Amino acid sequence: MAKKNVDVSVIVPAYNEEKYIGACLAAIKRQKFSGTFEVIVGDGNSKDGTQKISRDYGARVVEEKFGTASGGRYAGSKIARGKIYIFTSSDTVPGEGWVQNIYDMFQDKNVVWAVGNVRPLEGNIVEHVGAVVLNICAAVLNPLGLVYVNGDNVAARASAYWKCGGFNPRLKTAEDTDLGMKLMKLGRFAFSRKATVMISMRRVRKWGYWNFMTFHTGNFLAAHFGRAPSKMYEPIR
């Protein structure tokens, strides 16, 4: 039986995320979209109820073998049927119109990848200001060729994604920057303030603002200067 293609595949990596993934998938399920889309969870062999919750929300579940979020994204993309792949994380809550607004950016046939807006879930003033700065970085730096990507809200045209090899499942961190750098060589970048996801602050608060900022700044610089990104990124539950 032939696979039925869809317009968009929404791909969510997960590992032991039963506390969070329900809210994420519920928000995705509520999306109003002019086309057709599927939801895929790339699961890292979760030991809790993550897989059951995912299936209860109608997601297709595939297990990844690398023990990384990138592995989950890659495994999901391997079975995806969409023309556009949208990637988020299991602890996010996508906003209204998210799928449609991302899809609309790809109506320009020259666009091969895109990034949307991020906002903190239950954030304080410092976290909201930080998110504004990150959104400005994404909107301004990428068109200049200096790739900045937040893997919580990134999308790619399927044909370009596979032409560049897609996510590297072996990368523990900076897999989103790696993908963006590969896609940048193939076509145009787009950014939408309307395509918003609310992101968890659990890692920011666990690590502290300074440690979080210095870690990701260091990884960003490593990616752009040809050095290996960090291999350490412990789960925060």
Task: Label the model's feature ranges.
Residues 49, 88-105, 181:
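Acidic donor-binding/catalytic loop of UDP-sugar-dependent glycosyltransferases
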Residues 64-80:
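Glycine-rich, basic loop-to-helix element that forms the pyrophosphate-binding segment
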Residues 96-126:
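Conserved donor NDP-sugar-binding/catalytic core segment of glycosyltransferases
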Residues 26-36:
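Short, acidic, metal-binding catalytic loop of nucleotide-sugar glycosyltransferases
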Residues 27, 43-51, 92:
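A conserved acidic beta->alpha catalytic loop
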Residues 85:
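Short aromatic/hydrophobic "clamp" motif used to bind/position activated sugar donors
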Residues 1-27:
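N-proximal low-complexity "stem/linker" segments adjacent to membrane-targeting elements
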Residues 173-179:
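Acidic donor-binding loop at a coil-to-helix junction in glycosyltransferase catalytic cores
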